[in-house]
Curated annotation (Swiss-Prot):
Compartments where found: Cytoplasm
Listed name of the protein: Pimeloyl-[acyl-carrier protein] methyl ester esterase
The species this protein was found in: Pectobacterium carotovorum subsp. carotovorum (strain PC1)
Entry EC number(s): 3.1.1.85
Designated gene of the protein: bioH
The organism's place on the tree of life at top rank: Bacteria
HAMAP family assigned to the protein according to its UniProt record, in alphabetical order: Carboxylester
The protein's assembly and partners: Monomer.
Domain named AB hydrolase-1: residues: 16-242
Catalyzed reactions: 6-carboxyhexanoyl-[ACP] methyl ester + H2O = 6-carboxyhexanoyl-[ACP] + methanol + H(+)
One Pfam family recorded for the sequence: Abhydrolase_1
InterPro entries referenced in this protein's UniProt entry, alphabetically: AB_hydrolase_1 (IPR000073), AB_hydrolase_fold (IPR029058), BioH (IPR010076), Carboxylesterase_BioH (IPR050228)
GO molecular function, one term: pimelyl-[acyl-carrier protein] methyl ester esterase activity
Length: 255
């Protein structure tokens, strides 16, 4: 039976689970592990089908959340980046008693642009799916480049993301397509409006995938959560601005 890659480290007493985004793996957190480890017991996970968690096919958001939750500590703070933010949010909705606090990073409850809602145009996501079957590696690289666009360290950050992908086993086209399906179809705006778990949303001011307007719209709609927009950061603020990012995480965890 397929099992998740799950690594635990750190000197703190508080469990913090880190969930990566589409196409990547837990290696993406390496630049902030040393900053977080004194404060938390860190759990870094490769999502099903990604990195070292091989043997899983494409799956729904709720199935992915259930598989991750099955290996998780009894109670934890959950931090999810991008697609991982949807997984962490789904876990908070389906098992709130196991979630002390929720942090989403450069994530949206609805990644697809809709009337009155900023996001990625659905045909762009469909285009990525089409290109995946034609040129798998180039498509993943293009997506990674989009994530760092606009930051002062864009090239360096994109190189780091690419090395994270290439150092571990690559997800299959089926798994990547399944992840894009989730990004295209998921809409947790209404369910998360009633979430009773303490909830912090972190954004990059220059993010081209999750526009900063999302932060303001959700501030109005979700009175139960707070948002912080990190200036000059794009879709991977923990890579471009690790100090500002970890300060926010530690302050929220200790509040």
């Amino acid at each position: 039976m397929a099992t998740l890659y799950w690594q635990t480290e750190g000197a703190g007493n508080t469990d913090l689970v880190l969930l990566h985004g589409w196409g990547l793996n837990a290696q993406v957190w390496q630049s902030i592990i040393a900053r977080l480890a004194p404060h938390f017991r860190l759990h870094v996970v490769d999502l099903p089908g990604y990195g070292r968690s091989q043997g899983f096919g494409a799956m729904s958001l709720s199935d992915m959340a259930n598989i991750v939750l099955a290996q998780a500590p009894e109670r934890a703070i959950w931090l999810g980046w991008s697609l991982g933010g949807l997984v962490a949010s789904q876990i908070a909705l389906s098992a709130p008693e196991r979630v002390d606090k929720l942090i989403t990073v450069a994530s949206s409850p609805c990644f697809s642009a809709q009337d009155g809602w900023p996001g990625i145009k659905p045909d762009v996501l469909q285009g990525f799916q089409q290109q995946l079957s034609e040129d798998f590696q180039r498509t993943v690289e293009r997506f990674l480049a989009l994530q760092t666009l606009g930051t002062e360290s864009a090239r360096q950050d994109a190189r780091l993301l690419k090395s994270v992908v290439l150092e571990q086993p690559m997800p299959s086209v089926e798994v990547l397509n399944g992840g894009l399906d989730i990004l295209r179809e998921a809409d947790l705006r209404q369910p998360l409006a009633d979430l009773a778990v303490p909830f912090l949303r972190l954004y990059g001011a220059l993010d081209g995938l999750v526009p900063r307007k999302v932060a303001g719209l959700l501030d109005e709609q979700w009175l139960n959560s707070t948002s912080v927009v990190i200036p000059k950061a794009a879709h991977a603020p923990f890579i471009s601005h690790p100090d500002a990012f970890t300060e926010q995480v530690i302050a929220f965890a200790q509040a």
